[in-house]
Amino acid sequence: MDVPLASKTFPSPSPSKREQCNIDGHKSSSKHADLNPHVDDSVLGIILGGGAGTRLYPLTKKRAKPAVPLGANYRLIDIPVSNCLNSNISKIYVRTQFNSASLNRHLSRAYGSNIGGYKNEGFVEVLAAQQSPDNPDWFQGTADAVRQYLWLFEEHNVMEYLILAGDHLYRMDYEKFIQAHRETDADITVAALPMDEERATAFGLMKIDEEGRIIEFAEKPKGEQLKAMMVDTTILGLDDARAKEMPYIASMGIYVISKHVMLQLLREQFPGANDFGSEVIPGATSTGMRVQAYLYDGYWEDIGTIEAFYNANLGITKKPIPDFSFYDRSAPIYTQPRHLPPSKVLDADVTDSVIGEGCVIKNCKIHHSVVGLRSCISEGAIIEDTLLMGADYYETEADKKLLAEKGGIPIGIGKNSHIKRAIIDKNARIGDNVMIINVDNVQEAARETDGYFIKSGIVTVIKDALLPSGTVI
């Protein structure tokens, strides 16, 4: 089990890191690297909580997108926060706007008021959207979300701002990202994914020169426009064979921006721009600023839709190596310490699945599924290709007895129920002999009053929903 964050210390980087070397092994002469390159006291992390999450609805009905549960024990926000902490970045702000109560609660419980770092001054602090005489509107995009709190970010004595999204699944060493920014004397550095032609049409692409400097942008190009965006990805570090397979680079929506550049862009040059990706970054390129690409050639998933979220979760059960592993001790993923008992599995057949803490599983079959915290699965149930998010609390035996007397249904999965290719949100009450198998192969349906939606053929049962015994979906 990963060590709870509260019990783990985050040492300051070794003084030996203060003297950086470039690829050739010589001391860097970069104007940035001449300054203190200690990321722990020179970089401020800013995680953007995102919009209303309409494509992830109904999972975002009662929570912000970064607060959506992930991988049985975690939440999406744990990914960028953990990446920061593992990269020795311990001063972190999280910008929120929609349904932020559960996100705020999770962050305060998981990361506390002091998380170590440089001079023991680390923090993870939530900044909610607010209205003021100067800003009567809620924030309108990624750049506007930063601009509204620029007065606060400016107070920090840092060299760069690290702008991150709160709904991506990946593991990245931001120290290398930031060092590349400094060694290239960049004003802005954009994290980039190598792409093949099939995937490239769904992303915003970038074109670079022979020094890795971004010179052109194109949003979801096709045909001849797509071919015009081909680049030599060996410039960014791919070998010849892989560069041939991946001749495009797409923006990950992750940026390192020098402090003085950020202030200049958002206040002076583009005071009305709302979005980094479509307005501020291309604008900076057009005005002659040095905007560099930094290649990230690892697993990355934008958890923007129900289908992407479902696939990312089920991907952690993949054999022999999952798409994303929560078992990497060199870069662990931290979360809220809940002090739950071990899961109890009684006469159950469980294969190719991940089981969270505190579950009670009785005489049932579970295959290729992720079972979340405090899940209760009754006798005879069959769970296949499914994500169960679990529950926020246990019901006592007295509660269950009282429910039974009133004809109610306890939290969890009832006896002899069959669930396949579904997402069951927290605290759902699934009765006995319920079939959630999409019998009619429906691809899209909104049945909110009945407690479920279907998107991309995946049935999603709403948080706190009740499906009576005998229900068939």
From Swiss-Prot:
Cross-referenced InterPro entries: ADP-Glc_PPase, ADP_Glu_pyroP_CS, NTP_transferase_dom, Nucleotide-diphossugar_trans, Trimer_LpxA-like_sf
EC number: 2.7.7.27
Main EC class the enzyme belongs to: transferase
Tissue distribution: Abundantly expressed in the whole grains, a slightly less abundant expression is seen in leaves, while a low level expression is seen in the roots. A greater expression is seen in the endosperm than in the embryo and pericarp layers.
Record's catalysed reaction(s): alpha-D-glucose 1-phosphate + ATP + H(+) = ADP-alpha-D-glucose + diphosphate
GO biological process terms held by the UniProt record: glycogen biosynthetic process; starch biosynthetic process
Biased composition (Basic and acidic residues): 16-36
UniProt entry tagged with the keyword Transit peptide: yes
GO cellular component terms given for this protein: amyloplast; chloroplast
Region called Disordered, residue ranges: 1-36
Subcellular location field: Plastid, Chloroplast; Plastid, Amyloplast
Activity control note: Insensitive to 3'phosphoglycerate and orthophosphate.
Keyword annotations from UniProtKB, A to Z: Allosteric enzyme, Amyloplast, ATP-binding, Chloroplast, Nucleotide-binding, Nucleotidyltransferase, Plastid, Starch biosynthesis, Transferase, Transit peptide
Task performed by this protein: This protein plays a role in synthesis of starch. It catalyzes the synthesis of the activated glycosyl donor, ADP-glucose from Glc-1-P and ATP.
Subunit structure: Heterotetramer.
Protein name (record): Glucose-1-phosphate adenylyltransferase small subunit, chloroplastic/amyloplastic
Organism for this UniProt entry: Triticum aestivum (Wheat)
Lineage, top ranks: Eukaryota, Viridiplantae, Streptophyta, Embryophyta, Tracheophyta
